[in-house]
């Protein structure tokens, strides 16, 4: 049978999601915990292979097993074997045709940026930081050019393994909540470092270094060297993965908010 889990984790505790020869990863940590409850080794597949330092409130993973457990048993059992930076939020059984990555129809990322002269202490590693004042209205205006089908080569990491740089950006939103600027990206899929590179470019606009028209020119040029530097991973969250309704998965993703008391 194929079991699907909804997972939340603090990425600052790991060297990314995907298993690697050296370094602590979310996948290795989860596989060890699930394997103990399943009573056999498991191999996980995820919706999004987040980088080192990137967080998730709504990662989706699946694995195959012959072990029979109630959904609540998978949640409680696996969580009992996990350390605090990772938690399983829900579990369900899916058909053999389900795949956490290839069946996903869209994904949502949120970047939370602390825009203040003083760096954050309690939220260090949980939000990005930029001290010069930013114009969120200018950034929101610039972001409109990103919506729709585009070749995002200008915002693609050199080592990106995606077959095509063309993606459908459903929506980009930029809004301020006090000292926080929140960037929301919703697309069918994302390239490696794409969100962090887009945030970097929008920050260039927000601080007045470039106009909104510049971002459209960079997008059209498809040249990575013309864009901004890659922004830090600290404030980036995978906060939603959408699937076709017939899979009947719990919820539609968990969107992290910016509370007055800044804990999540």
Curated annotation (Swiss-Prot):
Name the Pfam families for this protein: PseudoU_synth_1
Q: What does the record give as the function of this protein?
A: Formation of pseudouridine at positions 38, 39 and 40 in the anticodon stem and loop of transfer RNAs.
- Can you name the source organism? Aromatoleum aromaticum (strain DSM 19018 / LMG 30748 / EbN1)
Biological process (GO) annotations held by this record are: tRNA pseudouridine synthesis
Catalytic activity, reaction form: uridine(38/39/40) in tRNA = pseudouridine(38/39/40) in tRNA
Q: Which residues form the active site?
A: 51
Gene name of this polypeptide? truA
Which UniProt keyword terms apply here? Isomerase, tRNA processing
User: Can you tell me which residues bind substrate?
Assistant: 109
Phylogenetic lineage: Bacteria, Pseudomonadati, Pseudomonadota, Betaproteobacteria, Rhodocyclales
- Which GO molecular function entries does the Swiss-Prot or TrEMBL record give? RNA binding; tRNA pseudouridine(38-40) synthase activity
Coiled-coil intervals: none
Name of this protein: tRNA pseudouridine synthase A
- Would you say which domain of life the source belongs to? Bacteria
- Homology family: Belongs to the tRNA pseudouridine synthase TruA family.
Oligomer status and interactors:
Homodimer.
The record's annotation in InterPro entries points to: PsdUridine_synth_cat_dom_sf (IPR020103), PsdUridine_synth_TruA (IPR001406), PsdUridine_synth_TruA_a/b_dom (IPR020097), PsdUridine_synth_TruA_C (IPR020095), TruA/RsuA/RluB/E/F_N (IPR020094)
For the protein in the UniProt heading, the enzyme class is isomerase
Q: What is its EC number?
A: 5.4.99.12
